[in-house]
């Protein structure tokens, strides 16, 4: 029996390639790059995991950031970060740069123009927290988010695998109404892998504000067991189908080797 004719109007997902031999800095193209993290469920962990593995990196922010003095060698609170870079000693790396301590538990961030100046002056990678998520695992950006400098090389949209199967509510999701608008789902609906992928791959979601010459490399974090891995692989496959990104990184950022899998 002959196979049925192929309908040329139907798009078929090609099988995704998988590998686990890529380290985090290579997977995120982070060496000597300006890397901006957005989304929820692993932004700060990504910044610090990269900072631990790169040569003379800067950690900074264009939005509020929790106190991180214990995650870097030194923090300079300064309105003149370029001078602080020039004056940094060999023992100051990774170096944190922030403009002001807003309260006991967080710093303010610089405007994007200043972050761009930091990146231009930095001797290595500049790692930037570029939006907030209020400790949730999944989000869509607000009206004035993200805050990405124009010279960003890599933008990393992040979500946690743990949201799959959970309800679309404020308990785990920052701005669930915006997520619902992007995905066409209703508040309270069960979050599917396709919903996470839709947000991460959307110009109104994870790809919002990505400069034209920057590379977006999505991350699905908190891949803690095989169920999480299955959900993360499904998310990754959908992202690769929907968006022009080179790969999706599956991570467990609290692990010594944080890359679980690279899906290309």
Describe the function of each predicted region.
Residues 1-34:
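Extreme N-terminal, non-catalytic leader segments
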Residues 2-4, 24-28, 40, 117, ...:
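Core catalytic machinery and nucleic-acid-binding channels of phosphodiester-processing enzymes
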Residues 19, 44, 49-106:
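N-terminal phosphate/diphosphate-binding loop that engages ATP/GTP or pyrophosphate donors
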Residues 23-54:
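Walker A (P-loop) phosphate-binding motif
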Residues 37, 57-62, 96-99, 126-130, ...:
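General beta-strand structural signal in soluble alpha/beta enzymes
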Residues 59-64, 242-255:
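Beta-strand->loop->alpha-helix junctions that form or flank phosphate-binding loops
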Residues 90, 96-138:
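Hydrophobic alpha-helical segments and helix pairs
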Residues 106-107, 120, 133-243, 261-263:
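Conserved catalytic-core segment of NTP-binding enzymes
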């Amino acid at each position: 029996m002959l196979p049925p004719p192929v309908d040329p109007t139907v798009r078929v997902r090609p099988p995704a390639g998988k590998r686990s031999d890529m380290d985090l800095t290579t997977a995120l193209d982070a060496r000597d790059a300006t890397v901006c993290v957005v989304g929820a469920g692993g932004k700060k962990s990504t910044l610090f995991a990269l900072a631990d593995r790169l040569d003379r990196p800067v950690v900074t922010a264009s939005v509020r950031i929790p106190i991180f003095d214990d995650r870097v060698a030194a923090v300079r609170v300064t309105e003149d970060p370029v001078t602080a870079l020039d004056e940094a000693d060999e023992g100051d790396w990774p170096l944190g740069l922030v403009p002001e301590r807003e309260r006991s538990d967080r710093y303010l961030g610089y405007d994007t123009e200043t972050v761009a100046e930091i990146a231009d002056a930095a001797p290595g990678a500049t790692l930037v927290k570029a939006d907030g998520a209020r400790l949730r695992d999944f989000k869509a950006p607000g009206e004035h988010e993200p805050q990405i400098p124009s010279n960003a090389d890599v933008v990393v949209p992040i979500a946690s695998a743990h949201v799959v199967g959970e309800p679309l509510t404020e308990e785990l999701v920052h701005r669930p109404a915006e997520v619902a608008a992007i995905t066409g789902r209703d508040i309270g609906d069960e979050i599917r892998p396709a919903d996470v992928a839709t947000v991460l791959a959307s110009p109104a979601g994870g790809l919002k504000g990505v400069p034209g010459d920057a590379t977006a490399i999505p991350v699905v974090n908190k891949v803690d067991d095989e169920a999480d891995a299955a959900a993360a692989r499904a998310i990754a496959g959908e992202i690769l189908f929907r968006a022009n990104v080179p790969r999706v990184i599956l991570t467990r950022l609290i692990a010594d080797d944080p890359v679980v899998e690279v899906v290309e």
